[in-house]
Curated annotation (Swiss-Prot):
Pathway field: Pyrimidine metabolism; UMP biosynthesis via de novo pathway; UMP from orotate: step 2/2
Keyword entries, A-Z: Decarboxylase, Lyase, Pyrimidine biosynthesis
Reactions that this protein is recorded to catalyse: orotidine 5'-phosphate + H(+) = UMP + CO2
Gene coding for it: pyrF
Family of this protein: Belongs to the OMP decarboxylase family. Type 2 subfamily.
Pfam families listed in its UniProt record: OMPdecase (PF00215)
Active site per database record: 95 (proton donor)
Gene Ontology MF term list: orotidine-5'-phosphate decarboxylase activity
EC number: 4.1.1.23
SMART domains in the record: OMPdecase
Species for this entry: Polaromonas naphthalenivorans (strain CJ2)
Protein name: Orotidine 5'-phosphate decarboxylase
PROSITE patterns cross-referenced by the UniProt entry: OMPDECASE
EC class (word): lyase
InterPro entries: Aldolase_TIM, OMPdecase_AS, OMPdecase_type-2, OMPdeCOase_dom, RibuloseP-bd_barrel
């Protein structure tokens, strides 16, 4: 089953567009786990177990593991997710961006070492930096396009030439992903929830690609506006929330609290989709 197929199956089975981001910070761990980097796996596995039936995907951020020399715990977590939630695709948030043999090694890391179903990439170095990942049949790759951070304006919102009618850089990336770069049919785009107008523009340029949309929750993105801007029938969106869910409680009930917040967010997204369908139906 390809990554795109897995997304569709998880969306139907779990009635969800919600992705839970796994960004473990031991200093923020609740209760008995507080401050203990050796418990990264335990913390993340508890979140996974509590939310696996509510999500379209999980998204572990590799830096949060590597910073604590916890890559072995990430490997265990990937195996755990495959075991307890085989229907839910896992997006490795790595934002790699290199060329040639180095990119090939990063692709091996993502898809062979960790067994991810998809990976996030920076396309700044051009197609050479993306091509090694496309050799993996059925594996997904999300290109950074219009990210949720304020500094994204420095590059992504600039025109390719100082002439009216020329596309902005993020629009050009979307066109490449929708067209000539999508050799394995599994490309997607990262577009921040903090910019709903840009989400709508990306969706117009790339009408069929899956959109990974971070920024809902702690970053302040509006869930309903995100769905209205990006969701279309047959064009999936994966709306990520990390800190608002995984740190919903500072006590030992953190997994139960994460489930409650994930359920609330999922239902907000589903209600917004239902509203969009009603508006679109004559």
């Amino acid at each position: 089953m390809t990554f795109i197929d897995m997304l569709g199956a998880a969306e139907r089975q779990n009635h969800s567009m919600l992705c839970v981001g796994l960004d473990p910070e031991p200093a923020r761990f609740p209760g008995r786990l507080a401050g203990d980097a050796s418990k990264i796996y335990d913390f993340c596995a508890a979140i996974v177990d509590a939310t696996a039936d509510l999500v379209i995907a999980f998204k572990p951020q590799i830096a949060y593991f590597a910073a604590h020399r916890a890559e072995d715990q990430l490997e265990r977590l990937m195996a755990h997710m495959r075991r307890v939630a085989p229907q839910v695709p896992v997006i490795l948030d790595a934002k790699r961006g290199d060329i040639g043999s180095t990119a090939e090694q990063y692709a091996i890391e993502a898809f062979e070492r960790y067994g991810a179903d998809a990976v996030t990439l920076s396309p700044f170095m051009g197609f050479d930096s993306v091509a090694p990942y496309l050799k993996y049949h059925g594996k997904g790759s999300f290109l950074l396009c219009r990210t949720s951070n304020p500094g994204g304006d420095d590059l992504q919102n600039q025109r390719l030439a100082s002439v009216d009618g020329q596309p902005l850089l993020y629009e050009h990336i979307a066109r490449l992903a929708q067209g000539p770069w999508n050799l394995n049919g599994q490309l997607g785009l990262v577009v921040g929830a903090t910019y709903p107008a840009e989400i709508e523009r990306v969706r117009a340029v790339a009408p069929t690609l899956p959109l990974l949309i971070p920024g809902v929750g702690a970053q302040g993105g509006d869930a309903a506006a995100t769905v209205r801007a990006g969701w279309r029938p047959g064009a999936p969106i994966i709306v990520n929330s990390s800190r608002a869910i995984i740190y919903a409680s500072s006590g030992d009930d953190f997994a139960d609290a994460a489930r409650r917040e994930a359920l609330r967010t999922r239902d907000v997204l589903q209600a917004a989709r239902a509203d969009s369908l009603r508006v679109a139906t004559p």
